[in-house]
Amino acid sequence: MGLSFTYFDVINAPKFAGLHNYITLLTGDEVFMKYVLPNTVLYAIVVGIGGYILSFLMAWLLAQGTPRIRTVYALAMYTPSMVGQVLITVIWKTIFSGDQTGLANAYLQKFGIIDQPIQWLISSDYFMPIMIFVSLWSSMGIGFLSMLSGILNIDQELYEAAYVDGIKNRAQEIIYITVPSMKPQMLFGAVMAIVNAFNMGWIGVALAGANPTPDYSG
């Protein structure tokens, strides 16, 4: 971080440059302003906020099931966050392979939706949506389990009392009982969502197999 405020090379010692490097980056780098910054903002918003909301909704839905079903599905949803980068890359590059052996192309051609295979991971039109989808798929980690634990630990008598006091549906139940009763877990989930959003940039490079990604799309 400190070096970003200096000018240096392999020969001379760093010299303090103030905000010059940042000004140059924001005003002189066309690629950064046109592609990198908008894509980063879009990715952070969708994966960060979207992953946070999705984690809560999935946790709430699982909490409504039986313990056995809940355990199986929770494990299935948490597993992607535990597998390594190599396995995630192999799985999704197999699905979105650009030839007829790719699962996405194979099924779309089988049902007559497309005539020719789509180059999913080469086309900038598809790359960012795929990157976001894979990131959301692998984002059900500690934050998700924390929310699930928070929901399961809410005193059921609160819900019973709320319905006596006038709560009429599940939406009001979530707004007035569930969320206020699990604020620590919600805060922890928010922190983890932010951390995950900034730690998943490797997914784009892994899917594309190169850096930069196609047309700087991811």
Q: What is each PLM-predicted segment?
A:
Residues 1-218:
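A structural signal for multi-pass alpha-helical bundles of membrane permease subunits
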